[in-house]
Amino acid sequence: MGNSYAGQLKSARFEEALHNSIEASLRCSTAVPRPIFSQLYLDPDQHPFSTADVKPKVEDLDKDLVHPYTQNGSVDFSHNVAMNEMEDDEDEEEMSDSNSPPIPYSQKPAPEGSCTTDGFCQAGKDLRLVSLCMEQIDIPAGFLLVGAKSPNLPEHILVCAVDKRFLPDDHGKNALLGFSGNCIGCGERGFRYFTEFSNHINLKLTTQPKKQKHLKYYLVRTSQGVLSKGPLICWKECRSRQSSALCHSTKPISSVSSAVAPENGTANGYKAGFTVTEAANGTSGHGGKSSSCSSTPSRPGNYSLSPRPTFTSVDQANMFISGPPKKRHRGWYPGSPVSQSALVVPAPTVRPLSRTEPLLSTPVPQTPLTGILQPRPVLAGETVIVPENLLSNSGVRPVILIGYGTLPYFYGNVGDIVVSPLLVNCYKIPQLENKDLEQLGLTSTHLLSVENMILLTIQYLVRLGPDQIPLREEFEQIMLTAMQEFSVRERALPLGAPCAPMSPAQLPWLARLAASVSQDLVHVIVTQNSLAEGISETLRLLSEMKHYQRLPDYVVAICASKIRGNEFCVVVLGQHQSRALAESMLTTSEFLKEISYELITGKVSFLASHFKTTSLGDDLDKLLEKMQQRRGDSVVTPFNGDLDECVSPQEAAAMIPTQNLDVDNETFQIYQPQLTVARRLLSQVCAIADSGSQSLDLGHFSKVDFIIIVPRSEVLVQQTLQRVRQSGVLVDLGLEESGLAHQRAERYVVRLDNEIQSKFEVFMRRVKQNPYTLFVLVHDNSHVELTSVISGSLSHGEPTHGLADRVINCREVLEAFNLLVLQVSSFPYTLQTQQSRISSSNEVHWIQLDTMEDAGCEKLYFGLDEYSKSLQWGITSPLLRCDETFEKMVSTLLERYPRLHSMVVRCYLLIQQYSEALMALTTMASLRDHSTPETLSIMDDLITSPGKNKSGKGHMLVIRVPSVQLAMLAKERLQEVRDKLGLQYRFEIILGSPASELTVETHFVTRLKTWRGNDQDEWIPRTYQDLEGLPCIVILTGKDPLGETFPRSLKYCDLRLIDSSYLTRTALEQEVGLACCYVSKEVIRGPAAALDLSAKEAERVPASENDSEELLIDLERPQSNSSAVTGTSGSIMENGVSSSSTAGKPQQQLLTPTSSIRLDEGVSASTAVVGEILKQECDSLDPPMASSTTSKPSSSSSSSAQALAWSRQPRGLHTALPPVIILSKAAYSLLGSQKGGRLPSSSSLLPHADVAWVSSLRPGLHKDMSSEEQSLYYRQWTSARQHHADYSNQPDPISGARTLHPRRLLLTGPPQVGKTGSYLQFLRILFRMLIRLLEVDVYNEEEINTDHSDDSELSQSEGEPWPDIETFSKMPFDVSVHDPKYRLMSLVYSEKLAGIKQEVIKEYKVEEPRQRETMSMMLTQYAAYNTFHHCEQCQQYMAFTPASQMSDSTLHAFTFSSSMLGEEVQLYFIIPKSKESHFVFSKQGRHLESMRLPLVSDKNLNAVKSPIFTPSSGRHEHGLLNLFHAMEGISHLHLLVVKEYEMPLYRKYWPNHIMLVLPGMFNNAGVGAARFLIKELSYHNLELERNRLEELGVKRQCVWPFIVVMDDSCVLWNIHSVQEQTSQPTEAGISSKNVSLKSVLQHIEATPKIIHYAILGIQKWNSKLTSQSLKAPFSRCHVHDFILLNIDLTQNVQYDFNRYFCEDVDFNLRTNSSGLLICRFNNFSLMKKHVQVGGQRDFIIKPKLMVSENVVPILPLQYVCAPDSEHTLLAAPAQFLLEKFLQHASYKLFPKAIHNFKSPVLAIDCYLNIGQEVAICYVSSRPHSSNVNCEGVFFSGLLLYLCDSFVGADLLKKFKFLKGATLCVICQDRSSLRQTIVRLELEDEWQFRLRDEFQTANSSDDKPLYFLTGRHV
């Protein structure tokens, strides 16, 4: 209700304090209020406060801590709530003592008409922080802006104005009871009750409104003026609530605190030193709270150390002060700290967390943990008083490494100690599953006793070198090895034999024995009562230690207690070790803020004053002034001159160097490794599409678009833009015109800054608006700033916090089906955790670097491993160096300035070193001995190299200074020294900050332009690569290097500031990644020769040719940690410092500038690449028909020539060498560790600060593991921390499955290896694959029944283009069906069939139904397409036209009479406006009269004459109805024939097609109806056109009588020709070529005397087409699927409109029997696509009346039944049931015909499939028809199907039947069945029984068909 213990009492009246204490006692249910006397008398507030000295708030502590600490070190329980915002509501409820549900709170209803929307007040005004963060809000004096949380809007904070008297105030006074607040939305004031206020702002609470529950945060403005979430408001409930989250341990838990005295006597509001972090127990494995109290050790958390400045206005905010416990209170409130000075009275103490459940069987008393925390009273032996001025007196801030057991309470000067949880998890051995134990080689996890662990710890500390610090990962492996040895020993013992344990009594002397070999660097202190004794003794000795006495580095304090067992901890006293451990506990952001604070508050003033004098004791500024005066106005000559040559500034500015065109500077080449990786990416995308998960449909897309998101670095943005422009990818993808691509490129590269949201929304709009474009979102350097949006509120002004998460993981991105996410990283470890969103199978790793050498690359990658290996090369000047002299200087300075961060000290020293080196090399040789040889060597090379030639080219030095403030200081200082020495025209100093563009002086820009031959006046360098050849120092700042590529002239990389603060793998390796590059092969193959090459080369170059523009690099420079040469004389050359050499002029045309090559990301390496290799960029995809898919080479002709020129030069003349890296000692010991082999390497460190190890027991990560293996290792053993963007991606609690984003890939490769070029190439080949390399499955089946065919004696000679009508008409018709789709159909009887042995036929024919064979083919430019194809050329076929265009079509009825149907038929045409020219309309009323037809004599090369009809059903999406490409874009008349009910769908998908809509009566009809109506309509139209044209004087026979009827699955057409036979006796091959439908039709339409042919067609393609099958160029046989039909000749031959199957075979047989010609062109073939939906599909046959939901399969024999029976009636067309029944009933209907092909079934006027075991003899009843010769044939059956009047009794009497032959008569109804029997006199020869009458199983409403069977007598 208003009490607060978040402050201390300053000078309050007794009554007020008493009142508040009484109220707190009454209201407190979970913890003890602060005693009244401690409020009054223990107030330590002695320090005046200055608001000007407030330090900006450091980032919140690591989220894995159980208690976050406040700025003074006391436990601030409220922070756990802040970090688990999503759990607020749960936490509230967990305070309840019972498990009963909370009583719901009933709110007063809102006033009528008021707004009730969450996030808005009742007046309808927005209160959400996201909406108001930029608003200027006026609040009355005395009010503060605070944030309220609504349970309905967990992600939002509501802004309120509250009177600060009712909040816990800044001065520690208790908040007044009650409430006073204003609504900042509508401005309403004077809310006196929080209940009333909560109603007004629509909090909609389910519990009683309390300000303590719902007012959560102070709101503060950032430096940018943005209102954002500030610190928590510390209500008492927030603190006590923590109890529920602490129930991991079964013992009471106390806290650690460090009350801190102001440093240096200042009172600036900053808590000096470091906070003591919390220790023994992490939170649960995922960083959250545990819901049940478990004694199982939790997964290790991760800890960080944070100096905690305050947001509030006093030093002591949030500090608890309590006196001794009183009996009436239930317990001592945990976390009570002490005053800042040690108190004489028994002071309240700070205590670390007690140890968790013992892991080993040591006798430890157990205390049950209840719902409230009840730590026991402090015992005298369990407290440690930290001595005053410990840090000041000793120069050491001790670090206490928590070991095993209960740490004591600390009080007094606790700011001078640090408690570190570094090794604590090593001692908490987790329970592992059996499979994990087996993997680790362990029998159990209970192998090590506490005594073993103590001895292992001591041995480890003894083994550490003087410059090393303990590493958790290293010690974990030691513990694991020990456990494995114990396991081996345990297995070796006989069964049941005990392993003798170490007794507690043996421990002290064994421990001392182990430490005795450490040369007094490790001490052991053994006590009997508690650890407090040992720690107190250690601190006392430290405070009394004299400066000349040697301190041990480590003191191991052991408590050998008989009651509690052995406990221990380690006190680190080593000057280097303690500082390094303390600093390594800070995250990068935290230590940068710490440095910033030290600079802002003037804490560095002592250090700065120290460096105001030179090493010789002179005043530096005065000395520089004196040198400037001595030099006067002149400056050192810019180039081509010595350092002592001076010119005027005007002359220096006007000096123009010789032009040195770098030919391939602007060209972009893709090298073989990049192409290989791009293809891997492409194949992975294909794998996603093929996975069956339906997450990606590549056939849907015809275009590729992209966006590249990069971290917040201006240089990186410009660098990526350059790559995009140079690669030409925008033009290649068709995204931009070539003229505009350069300026439009900026749309495609976006940086993660505050403006990204709007840009990204534009991109996502494009994604939604273009469903047929596949978008690729490339997230480059994706490991940077991968923090979650939810934790963004804790970042306090971090500009990029959560932005990547907001973009990459937003719902729209995850759900967009046309968006691929490609995350690219050199250090992907933070993306490879247990919570990763990327499937491990979707990772694409760079190719093994040794394979690059095998591929014959001229340049090889030189990365981190190569740098480490180079230490073993034995060369005099290693590439990886540690400046020992510098490290000694640093060490001395750090002892003098123990309170400053070591990076500050290092940076000041580095500035001095470079300044003095400049002075020593120019004017003060006496300073030479005071610069380290390393620094002197670098500066000498830098300033002398431009003077050696007329080009003025030189080297680049990169100095890495992570702190922006320090970097600016370094730049200003070095620039000042340079200018005063007159070197401002000699070399440039550039600040490389991520936030700003490069700034280069005008005269240097002019020089760069000259070298480039760049005549663009406005050009300025925008990337580091643009600085190629410029002598310069780049001071690279920013938290992380962000993947910027440096030029080939980079020669030195100074990383001496990168030290113990960089103890994660990513942090350390990405720093060295700056220098990685491509080098000449010789450097890796023969390093000693290669690296000493340049010195020998120098001897050969004549002095007269010193004006060459080429530079050679010499690495023979002294370095301080191996064979350093410290010069003593003033001569530079004597000192061996400078030996840069030059190359002769004649070679310069052939040579590219030497030095290393930066292939990353894809630009202009001078690698020998023969241009032809990569011209075909899809050469891995070489389809048989893709000859047309060649692409232009990516590199320009100039670069190809240049690359070839390089390959012709003599090898070894110039060698591209890697830069030299100078490291700090800490980094060198980790990165150079391969040399010794014993030390840990960087790869064993925690992979990234945002992840945590899952278990302390895990196998080691080996250096030789492949990238893929490392990924699997990290995915198993690391988890995301709470602030990580992937933290929310937790496994499903039930299934354990993780949510993976199926369309997300990860490309990983070493830094600067060429990943950008690779993914740009990937975009290009992805596009090509979508457009040109689409594959299609076509049927690939050989013809059937080829052995039944009549061998025609008559045949035309090969090579004839058209059939000769005379010859062709004499050829017999081959009645056998050869189309493989009719494999299971009845054979058509011929004389040839009668002669074939039945056994062969039987054996051949009996086969199981099987899947039809298909083959994958490449679509060519002449393919027919479905709706999923879209391109610029065929826009008129685009699907989903807006509704406005649907009305562009008109509906026309067309009526004609049909003799077959016996009635008028009305069809509907839907004709788009654009197609109306094909039709004739009446002048009045626009009535459709006819469809225009051409003349036979027309000759138009850009048209085909025949209208194309395509019947289609069920394939509105998948039917191949887009004939634009197949017709080569020419005008043609194409009509879709669709059923009435499907018309809306087809109209939607094909709005620009002419539709012919069948009458509704044919909705359930088969394909026969469509073909029948097409033919009927066409004939009627032909007559209309003849009449119309006859009036115009055209003869009737001159009108074109043909139509094309084509299936909707015809995809490709081919032409075949027989190749010439060689002399060899092998069969001649055939050549095939893909052709267009247009050319096929035009060829067939040009057939001489074409009007005499009834049907023309082509054969079906199969892969085994041989010259034998093409022997006859034309066949007289069946044609299917694609026919030219002469509707005039076939006027009297009709399709059977009832048919569902075999309608074309039936029609062909009718046509042939009428004496008409059917011609098949064998030199053309048709490919049919395997379309899996729609078309000639079976009906699902089910009962008409469904009795139950379960559908029982209905067998074909149930499709018929006896008339009037109780049979289940079916819902299917009668004709369909009949045809399906006949296919399966041949055994019952025609038993004599089974496999009896000599005696076929006689079918009059019809062909029906009656099963593959039966042959059918087709006979026409028409007079003068040509039929097969039936003489001597005895038929086994007779089939009469709907026979007409031409069938008479006389006809039937001509045929002979076997005895027992069967008859089947089929009619429309029962009466016509009886009439037919009588009319045909069938009863004379056939016997009928009443039970032999059947009907199809339809109801009478559905008009069943009837049939009667009988037997021949």
From Swiss-Prot:
Gene Ontology cellular component list: membrane
Tissue: Expressed in the inner ear, with a high presence in the spiral ganglia, cochlear nerve bundles, and hair cells.
Biased composition (Low complexity): 289-301, 1187-1200
A Pfam family assignment: TAGT
Biased composition (Acidic residues): 86-96
Subcellular localization: Membrane
Region (Disordered): 86-111, 281-309, 1097-1157, 1179-1207
Stretch forming the signal peptide: none
Transmembrane segment boundaries: 1832-1852
GO biological process, one term: cardiac ventricle development
Sequence ranges of Polar residues compositional bias: 1118-1157
Disruption phenotype: Embryonic lethal at the homozygous state. At 13.5 dpc, all homozygous embryos are significantly smaller compared to wild-type and heterozygous littermates and present with exencephaly. Male and female embryos lack kidney and show absence of Wolffian and Muellerian ducts, respectively. However, mesonephric tubules are consistently observed. Some potential remnants of ureteric bud are present in most mutant embryos. In male mutant embryos, the gonads are severely affected, being small and with poorly organized sex-cords compared to wild-type littermates.
Membrane topology designation: Single-pass membrane protein
Keywords: Developmental protein, Membrane, Transmembrane, Transmembrane helix
Domain of life: Eukaryota
Primary role: Plays a major role in early metanephros and genital development.
Family the UniProt entry places it in: Belongs to the GREB1 family.
The protein, known as: GREB1-like protein
Organism field: Mus musculus (Mouse)
